Curated annotation (Swiss-Prot):
HAMAP family: Phosphoglyc_kinase
Positions annotated to bind ATP: K209, G297, E328, G354, G355, D356, S357
CDD domains given in the database record: Phosphoglycerate_kinase
GO biological process: gluconeogenesis; glycolytic process
Binding annotation for substrate: D22, L23, N24, R37, H60, L61, G62, R63, R119, R159
Protein name: Phosphoglycerate kinase
Keywords from the named record: ATP-binding, Cytoplasm, Glycolysis, Kinase, Nucleotide-binding, Transferase
Organism: Saccharopolyspora erythraea (strain ATCC 11635 / DSM 40517 / JCM 4748 / NBRC 13426 / NCIMB 8594 / NRRL 2338)
Length: 400
């Protein structure tokens, strides 16, 4: 798989380089609440502009319905990217239309153009190969002959989409530094990780993570379960979970996992329950098998944090994906904070699997450099660990 260094050694001055970045940041109105993904895109863009490339960035934001929608505009991202780069970033008013063509034609060496949200074009996410291919053809024409494509949006490499997969069949493709480092870290986890190897999985739904749980259990020493999905596991043990999140249709498969891998699966022993789903709800700590009928579990309890921390302290490799509770509410953030701190304190090779876990690290004020690696792609990380092919990576490995 060719990478950014290979491209730079070829020389990029005056060449157009299309960079697929992951700039899918959370917004409050037009204010970016977590710019982690924008920051993660900087090294690749800066190396290219520093070498004189004419950088054209394509990315998505949210899930627009295949047509322009002002609330999903990349305008706030263009502004923030410009601030971080210390240079103007021109935002094209469309994806491959006249505005994009004009912006790209006007580029000087070392400049950056950000195309408008690629998902404003319905062909980006089409299941029809020909439709996606048509958009990829237009993207290739936009950057012209002699151009290169750098895939640096790890958060989307598990998607077979025009700007991720099909474009690499039309323009010579290279893995950006971000994608390369992410794949190397995941290969470490799936290859020969230092043991003991512990995985912490949180989040709301068992159904979202059943595949990765089944794939990981034969490979890990301990798998710790937190978050909303813990209540389906507790129900599978025969406990009443009150009004906690429960996927009744997953209880049977969860029960089977407990029967086959009960020695590896570790569940909460106590939980923080609330009388309603709200930041100011009344709350108390109860044993995991004593959740009141009208209450809901919104976090793991202090004894669970202590139990999990003890396991993590003795681990040499840790992968964490998904918060332990509703960390956005301060009263229910201590489980997530405790797990994160225990991972940092363990001194292990530690990987935070993107998504809400990465957001939690930042919002709770934990030191990012306390972890070996914070992934920018939650879904992509999980699919890789599950053994699924990542189309955006495999197409680079095949080469054009």
């Amino acid at each position: 798989m060719k990478n950014l260094d290979d491209l730079l050694s070829e020389g990029v001055r005056g060449r157009r380089v299309l960079v697929r970045a992951d700039l899918n940041v959370p917004l409050d109105g037009d204010r970016i609440t977590d710019d982690g993904r924008v920051r993660a895109s900087l090294p690749t863009i800066e190396k290219l502009t520093g070498a004189g490339a004419r950088v054209v960035v394509t990315a998505h934001l949210g899930r627009p319905k295949g047509e322009p929608d002002p609330k999903f505009s990349l305008a706030p991202v263009a502004a923030r990217l410009g601030e971080l780069l210390g240079a103007d970033v021109a935002l094209a008013g469309d994806v491959v239309g006249e505005s994009a063509k004009s912006a790209v034609a006007a580029q000087a060496d070392g400049s950056v153009v950000l195309l408008e949200n690629v998902r404003f074009d319905a062909r980006e996410t089409s299941k029809d190969d020909a439709e996606r291919g048509a958009l990829a053809d237009e993207l290739a024409a936009l950057v012209g002959d002699g151009a290169a494509f750098v895939s640096d949006g790890f958060g989307v490499v598990h998607r077979k989409q025009a700007s991720v997969y099909d474009i690499a069949k039309r323009v010579p493709g290279y893995a950006g530094g971000l994608v390369l480092s992410e794949v190397e870290v995941l290969r470490t986890l799936t290859g020969d990780p230092r043991r003991p190897y512990a995985v912490v999985l949180g989040g709301s739904k068992v159904s979202d993570k059943l595949g990765v749980i089944q794939a990981l259990l034969p490979k890990v020493d301990k798998l710790l379960i937190g978050g909303g999905m813990a209540y389906t596991f507790l129900a599978a043990q025969g406990h009443s979970v009150g009004k906690s999140l429960l996927q009744q249709d997953q209880v049977e498969s969860t029960c089977k996992l407990l029967e086959e891998h009960g020695d590896k699966l570790v569940l909460p022993v106590d939980v923080v329950v609330a009388d309603r789903f709200a930041a100011d709800a009344e709350s108390r700590v109860v044993d995991a098998d004593a959740i009141p009928a009208d209450w809901m579990g919104l976090d793991i309890g202090p004894r669970s944090v202590e139990l999990f921390a003890g396991i993590l302290a003795g681990s040499r490799t840790v992968f964490w994906n998904g918060p332990a509770g509703v960390f956005e509410f301060p009263a229910f953030a201590e489980g997530t904070r405790g797990i994160a701190q225990a991972i940092v304190d363990s001194g292990s090779f530690s990987v935070v699997g993107g998504g809400d876990s990465a957001a939690a690290v930042r919002s709770l004020g934990l030191p990012e450099d306390g972890f070996s690696h914070i992934s920018t792609g939650g879904g992509a990380s999980l699919e890789y660990l599950e053994g699924k092919e990542l189309p955006g990576v495999s197409v680079l490995e095949e080469g054009r």
